[in-house]
UniProtKB/Swiss-Prot annotation:
Post-translational modification: Phosphorylated on tyrosine residues in response to EGF.
Subcellular location per the Swiss-Prot or TrEMBL entry: Cytoplasm; Nucleus; Lysosome membrane; Early endosome membrane
Record comment regarding domains: The PPxY motif mediates interaction with WWOX and NEDD4. The LITAF domain is stabilized by a bound zinc ion. The LITAF domain contains an amphipathic helix that mediates interaction with lipid membranes. It interacts specifically with phosphatidylethanolamine lipid headgroups, but not with phosphoglycerol, phosphocholine, phosphoserine or inositolhexakisphosphate.
GO terms, biological process: cellular response to lipopolysaccharide; negative regulation of non-canonical NF-kappaB signal transduction; positive regulation of canonical NF-kappaB signal transduction; positive regulation of transcription by RNA polymerase II; regulation of cytokine production; regulation of macrophage cytokine production
Record-annotated LITAF domain positions: 76-160
Positions of short motif PPxY motif: 20-23
Region (Disordered): 1-22
Cysteine disulfide links: none
Coiled-coil stretches noted in the UniProt entry, renumbered to this chain: none
Binding site for Zn(2+): C96, C99, C148, C151
The protein's name in its UniProt record: Lipopolysaccharide-induced tumor necrosis factor-alpha factor
Span list, region Membrane-binding amphipathic helix: 111-134
Length: 161
């Protein structure tokens, strides 16, 4: 019997497989495909048992969305805030607002309300022979002016009364 055309009849055992490939052969052939990632667990809202066996609600966590990029330039303005300075009866170290240098203030004592009140009180007690002027010699009874030693600007005043 002759076979028509260029084909010839196969001789010997049949080349077609008689059974499908085994599972191991199939997995080995398809091993170059990546496996899909495991699904991530979502936020839990149920009760979770704590270490003491009691149920407790876990806190919910939410992520903030990523900021949208903006091509506009951002301008930054620096603001310097100078706190109010409390003047006392002793020199203070500060930056002079007039000459902008770090200084230690110079003190000047002037008669204030407490000085005059002390003088009047001593007059009422009978210290008329010049003793009533003693408060004008005591620095602890007078107001204090703070001056800059560089530019002689008045920085502030401490009033005793």
């Amino acid at each position: 019997m002759s076979v028509p055309g260029p084909y010839q009849a196969a001789t010997g055992p049949s080349s077609a497989p008689s059974a499908p490939p085994s599972y191991e052969e199939t997995v080995a052939v398809n091993s170059y495909y990546p496996t899909p990632p495991a699904p991530m667990p979502g936020p839990t809202t149920g009760l979770v048992t704590g270490p003491d066996g009691k149920g407790m609600n876990p806190p919910s966590y939410y992520t903030q969305p990523a900021p949208i990029p903006n091509n506009n330039p951002i301008t930054v303005q620096t603001v310097y805030v100078q706190h109010p300075i409390t003047f006392l009866d002793r020199p203070i170290q500060m930056c002079c607002p007039s000459c902008n240098k770090m200084i230690v203030s110079q003190l000047s004592y002037n008669a204030g309300a407490l000085t005059w009140l002390s003088c009047g009180s001593l007059c009422l007690l009978g210290c008329i022979a010049g003793c009533c002027f003693i408060p004008f010699c005591v620095d602890a009874l007078q107001d204090v002016d703070h001056y800059c030693p560089n530019c002689r600007a008045l920085l502030g005043t401490y009033k005793r009364l």
